Curated annotation (Swiss-Prot):
The keyword Membrane applies. It catalyses: (S)-lactate(in) + H(+)(in) = (S)-lactate(out) + H(+)(out). It is a multi-pass membrane protein. PANTHER family: MONOCARBOXYLATE TRANSPORTER, MONOCARBOXYLATE TRANSPORTER 3. The gene is SLC16A8. Residues 468-478 have a biased composition (Acidic residues). Coiled coil: none annotated. Residues 226-247, 453-542 are annotated as: Disordered. It holds the Pfam family MFS_1. This is Monocarboxylate transporter 3. Gene3D superfamilies: MFS general substrate transporter like domains. Belongs to the major facilitator superfamily. Monocarboxylate porter (TC 2.A.1.13) family. GO terms for cellular component: apical plasma membrane; basolateral plasma membrane; plasma membrane. The keyword Metal-binding does not apply.
Amino acid sequence: MGRADPEEGQLPAPVKPPDGGWGWIVLFGCFVITGFSYAFPKAVSVYFKELMKDFHVGYSDTAWISSIMLAMLYGTGPVCSIMVNQFGCRPVMLIGGLLASSGMILASFTTNIIELYLTAGVLTGLGMALNFQPSLIMLGTYFDKRRPLANGLAAAGSPVFLSSLSPLGQVLLEKFGWRGGFLIMGGLLLNCCTCGAVMRPLDAGMKRKTEKAQDKYEAKEMLPMGGKSEEGISTTDGTKKTKKAKKKPKKGKKLLDFSIFSNRGFIIYTISKFILVLGLFVPPILLVNYAKDTGVPDTEAAFLLSIIGFIDIFARPACGMVAGLKWVRPHVAYLFSFAMLFNGLTDICSARASNYTGLVIFCVFFGISYGMVGALQFEVLMAIVGSQKFSSAIGLVLLIEAFAVLIGPPSAGRLVDALKNYEVIFYLAGSEVVLSALFLAMATYCCLNRGKKTPPPEKNPSAGGGSDTEEAESDVQEAEEHSSDNHQPAHGTDKATVAANEEANHVEDEQSGEGGRCPEADGEVSSRAGCNADQTVERDSF
């Protein structure tokens, strides 16, 4: 459909996601940000031995640096959502890049472990969090039909950067020491600012016109008749009074939209993701030590993680391509369930691996399933809540995941110390992932069956299926039709005309039954005078 003319007071059509063009630049920026966010906390572990010597602390003390980074990445999700909704993605990412870089640079001058916690842990972790979440939001803004593929390609940044940052950190440590390495790594993090700079708002050129059109549209709704800003009305004493149109006050923008908790699909996803995170990260954390306990040499044991990373690089884009197929995308939640089930069964089957060949086979299948989970997790969330509410949804989901991250891996480590047996831990972690998969699949199936019994309202998107732009265009088109019907030209302001108009309005109010009450149909955009046209269409993908 063509765009409405803002100068005529009509609402302009929404800007369609280009699914390409500048979106590929945004995708590359998201690829880099995802790589830094997930790989950096693991890459700094190459400096731990030197930090232990200089600060005279144990391994568990230095490991808190990575833990604090991850806690900031997950736990500050709602804060990031509020900042994005208030200031936009680009300013937040620029600030985040400066914070991340400053944290590592300041860490190179620290004299004790506590200062490292505050600089490399808190500052750098917060900076990466302020980059990670907005980059995903922008990716969902620029891609709609190709969004599964875009998510898969962006998620591939994690294994690519993990396989490159760790060797780079080792080289920097040998040539410049840990302080010089921290300085250079801080400089690398300034690339986050570059990635933030390319996150151009999709509606930058339309924002001012849209606000102007909205103001005119609301003003015309409030006019008594005819579309004039003032209208003379004759009174009994022969004088004239003017009746001015009053503009409705604008509703404040929600900094954090908690209405997504009314979406049962979001609740199902959140519970499933919490259970998943309890066991998902346990096998790769314990894999090297598990291999060493079975008699595998140190170099070969470390190579197992490289196998997982290499397979992961190709698994994520491939899974994104599969999820984008027309016959797969409406059922992306079931594909996500299959990926989790595949991952959990891999953990369970590998629990009794007793030689290097068995561990290599485990790493191949774990890399495939782990890549599938990484490629689909945010695509499913976008399909559930839509791009408009994704900024709030991802912040709340990451906050809930933070608790699971703090519970799962530490608890597994304590069980290993107590039982001296890795087999039980792999069984437990795999069972948690399988439980998450079964819960998501069964809950989705039950909710879909319930939805089939009750006919859904019109324009309600199917589960994880259609694009966001189609329903947005239909809402704006409906608003334009109401606007063109209601805005009739004036026929005069004499006393007889005004009386006739007032009588017609009175009859119309009586016929409406509720005196101008707004229609309450879900997703319907009302253009009647005095009605709130800011209703939103709830996306209930499940």
